[in-house]
Amino acid sequence: MKKYLVAAALMSLSATLSGPSYAADKPTIPIIVKDTTSFYWQIVLAGARKAGEDLGVKVPELGAQSESNINGQISILENSVAEKPAAVVIAPTEFKALGKPVDEAAKKVPVIGIDSAADSKAFTSFLTTDNVQGGRIAADGLAEAIKEKYGKAEGEVALITSLPGVGSLDQRAKGFKEEIASKYPGLKLVADKVADGQATTALNIMTDLITANPDLRGVFASNLIMAQGAGQAIAENKKADTIKLVGFDSDDKLIGFLKDGTIAALVVQDPYRMGYDGIKTALAASKHEKVPAFVDTGANLITKANMDQPKEHALLFPKVK
């Protein structure tokens, strides 16, 4: 099924880029995300789409159907570059695997990275959340939630990561662990779990953690899919009062969990800005204009207490269409 979906994406790409009127009057800058079905990546694509409208750029919206489909994304990148666009914007699925493909692509067109790094020094510019800082923010949010419940930031905590070898997730884990170790001596990391990118796996991991660690007080689920699964497990086991969960990113399900107390806090990026500024930067690079090597697009801790504030509300409810 995955092969079929990638093939369909590549056929769509070829038809889109090679149409007779397509490249005649506007530059083409494809954006390649990790998973076109994910709400997070749909927000990124919405930002890129708006940039295309504002700047007069054709923006093919591409990506595999799962973040674990690394080879699918590599094929899409190679075929995109073969169509000779003005530049390419990509969110690499996996750090090591995308290194060489990005190197090769950058020999032909400017490559702008967003969200997650690859093992390459060939990016013209890289726009992302400072994910180490994002992990620190999550640790602070979790410590505060535990303190509010138990009076002190003390007890057992756990970390759930979606996939191994993903730059952004590794950095979030790094920041989280460093902040816990340096700032919260009363918190003990008793489990560091890595899943397979599926929400059902996160649900099972969280359920097992609840069973194996009866004194568990907090969990950081470091991306949207892991937070979905972990939140579902906490809800099903009625543990929201005793186990505080901090997630990363947001969608309708996680916002619902935030409202009802299943999730204590969400670290929310600005994916719309990431997509918009990715296209804007790529266009500038294609014109040989100077662009920054790195742009931090920011992260914010959102709780039930502040979710209706203007800034936080805009991040939780972006205009996708």
Residue ranges and their predicted role:
Residues S21-K321:
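A residue-level marker of the well-folded mature domains of exported/periplasmic proteins
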Residues M1-A23:
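Gram-negative bacterial Sec-dependent N-terminal signal peptides
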